[in-house]
């Protein structure tokens, strides 16, 4: 389960404006529909000039461009702040009548991306339609410190007929779904290739590929091929497309470089790095609280003092971080430490969401599919590390400037299937990206916490200093023994003594000079899944659920010693049941 976060209504086009409070973080679409809806002030729509048209020669294989409209954000009333302004393009293939439209093959449909589109063979004789949508994301703030995120968009349409590929012209193909950067530490890659562009009278083309100087192989039916494991050094892939009209060949070359070694945490301004220990001074798991779905100020845990607060890096101010670390009560420390929560995904309500040139840090080509259930978020192409380094440096640097002790990186499992992410990424792509991110955290004087992603945890342990888990108890994925035999993406989990121990006891037993009793692991279970009862609940209220005492015995008690807590999925400070009961 993914970390709960901000969910708001998407305001489309015209006068209807609805906002859901930010505290609905993590809710499903159904839950969002049933959430209390607050009346929102009217926000002016995006401003545009000109008429949308499709420029270029619309035929099979041709690159066309949506153009003719200039957009800009409107002047906003006082009390409103523009968070991001985006222009998105969706391409559709329609019947000659202009009806019965479906998303065109190869349409990326990413925010402020896909302004250009290459018509395909399947579009011949049909109409190509583009929808250009400008959307603004605006924040309002009230006197009680609550805030709402509002969205409003305006769309324009244009369409053209698509002509056939020229007769007797050699067929062509193109790389799609992106390619790795020219230098990467990933030793394996997937390459997507477009269906051939050709004239039917010249015959159905064949496609073949090869890696380096290897044998030519038939292209798989899904037009995606895998390089296999590659050695450090230069590499090249080639694709050949041929029919009676002739043949063409495309190539892509890049260099695999060694993965950077883990960097030790560098003291900042004379202050030593803080490493979260497996067990605190009282020989028990170090207690923590997690508040990132905030619409109100941070809540102290009062008598249930904790040693660590995991809080939103953007929403929390430097003054709040200082107050927590110098004045708030703690459990075993003088004062609590603070963890800076950062999402590695694109979130449209963050101040860096706009593309470069508009005050943001996410190039259009790096954005993929929408997160399921989280329409305000997009997957990010981890292959494009150099393009995303400015974003990582700024976000992690923000945590350091605010005085955080550690950083939690969320959404690191970017090698999910392409149907989920929009990219064909490998575990090696994730390792290349995350090695840079965690080393950057250490270079800025903070420690780093791994998040979920058990298939890579055995590797991530070398670069990180602890872990945050979600519902490992619910899904029976806490220990190396529970995960043993799990296999995906070429990774097979072994037991704790094997080469790839995917369990989190691999962290707690990892004893280093900085963490002599192992690395801290915190687990969050959520009440909305009805898997663990609340403390003191019995009978009908707990029918079919595990008791709170059993949950604590399994995770908090030896030998695991996880800092186990039951939260509400909103993570807004209202629900906090740490193990053991009464703590």
Task: Label the model's feature ranges.
Residues 1-14:
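N-terminal export and membrane-targeting signals
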Residues 2, 31-32:
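Short Cys/His-based metal-binding microdomains
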Residues 8, 17-18, 24-30, 184, ...:
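Compositionally biased low-complexity segments, especially N-terminal hydrophobic helices
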Residues 15-17, 21, 27, 33-169:
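Ser/Thr/Pro/Gly-rich low-complexity disordered regions
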Residues 80-85, 202-203, 331-335:
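Short helix-terminating capping/connector loops at secondary-structure junctions
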Residues 110-115, 223-226, 421-428:
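Short helix/strand-bridging catalytic loops that position acidic/His residues to coordinate divalent metals
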Residues 161-263:
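Low-complexity, disordered linker/stalk regions enriched in Pro/Thr/Ser/Gly
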Residues 235, 258-583:
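Glycan-processing catalytic domains of CAZymes
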């Amino acid at each position: 389960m993914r970390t709960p976060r901000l969910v708001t209504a998407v305001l489309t086009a015209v006068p209807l404006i609805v906002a859901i409070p930010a505290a609905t973080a993590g809710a499903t679409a159904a839950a969002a529909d049933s959430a209390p809806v607050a009346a929102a002030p009217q926000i002016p729509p995006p401003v545009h000039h000109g008429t949308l048209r499709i420029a270029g020669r619309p035929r099979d294989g041709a690159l066309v461009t949506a153009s003719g409209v200039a957009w800009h954000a409107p002047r906003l009333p006082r009390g409103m702040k523009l968070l991001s302004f985006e222009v998105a393009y969706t391409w559709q293939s329609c019947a000659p009548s202009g009806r019965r439209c479906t998303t065109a093959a190869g349409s990326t449909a990413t925010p402020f991306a896909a302004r250009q589109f290459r018509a395909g063979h399947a579009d011949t004789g049909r109409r190509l339609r583009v929808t250009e949508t400008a959307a603004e994301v605006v924040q309002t703030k009230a006197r009680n410190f609550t805030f709402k995120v509002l969205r409003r968009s305006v769309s324009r349409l244009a369409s053209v007929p698509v002509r056939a590929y020229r007769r007797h012209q050699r067929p062509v193909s193109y790389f799609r779904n992106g390619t790795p950067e020219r230098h990467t530490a990933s030793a394996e890659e997937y390459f997507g290739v477009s269906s051939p562009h050709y004239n039917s009278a010249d015959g159905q083309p064949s496609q073949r590929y090869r890696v380096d100087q290897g044998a030519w192989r038939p292209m798989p039916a899904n037009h995606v091929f895998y390089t296999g494991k590659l050695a450090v050094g230069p590499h090249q892939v080639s694709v050949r497309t041929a029919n009676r009209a002739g043949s063409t060949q495309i190539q892509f070359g890049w260099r695999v470089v060694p993965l950077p070694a883990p960097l030790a945490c560098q003291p900042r301004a004379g202050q030593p790095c803080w490493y979260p220990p497996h067990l605190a001074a009282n020989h028990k798991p170090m207690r923590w609280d997690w508040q990132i779905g905030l619409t109100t100020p941070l809540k102290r845990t009062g008598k249930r003092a904790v040693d660590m607060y995991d809080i939103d890096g953007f929403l929390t101010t430097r003054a709040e971080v200082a107050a927590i670390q110098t004045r708030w009560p703690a459990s075993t420390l003088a004062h609590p430490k603070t963890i800076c929560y950062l999402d590695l995904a694109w979130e449209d309500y963050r101040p860096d969401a706009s593309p470069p040139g508009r005050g943001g840090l996410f190039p259009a080509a790096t954005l993929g599919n929408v997160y399921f259930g989280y329409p305000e978020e997009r997957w990010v192409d981890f292959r494009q590390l150099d393009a995303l380094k400015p974003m990582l440096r700024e976000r992690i640097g923000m945590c350091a400037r605010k005085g955080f002790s550690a950083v939690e990186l969320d959404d690191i499992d970017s090698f999910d299937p392409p149907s989920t992410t929009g990219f064909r990424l490998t575990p090696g792509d994730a390792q290349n990206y995350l090695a840079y991110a965690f080393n950057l955290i250490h270079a800025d004087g903070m420690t780093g916490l791994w998040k979920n992603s058990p298939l890579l945890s055995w590797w991530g342990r070398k670069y990180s200093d602890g872990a945050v888990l979600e519902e490992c108890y619910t899904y029976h994925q806490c220990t190396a023994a529970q995960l043993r035999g799990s296999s995906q993406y070429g990774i097979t989990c072994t037991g704790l003594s094997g080469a790839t121990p995917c369990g989190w006891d691999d962290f707690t037993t990892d004893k280093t000079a900085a963490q002599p009793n192992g690395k801290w692991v915190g687990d969050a279970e959520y009440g909305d899944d009805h898997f663990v009862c609340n403390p003191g609940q019995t009978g009908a209220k707990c029918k079919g659920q595990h008791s709170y005492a059993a949950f604590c015995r399994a995770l908090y008690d030896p030998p695991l010693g996880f800092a186990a807590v039951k939260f509400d999925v909103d993570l807004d400070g209202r629900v906090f049941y740490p193990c053991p009961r009464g703590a």
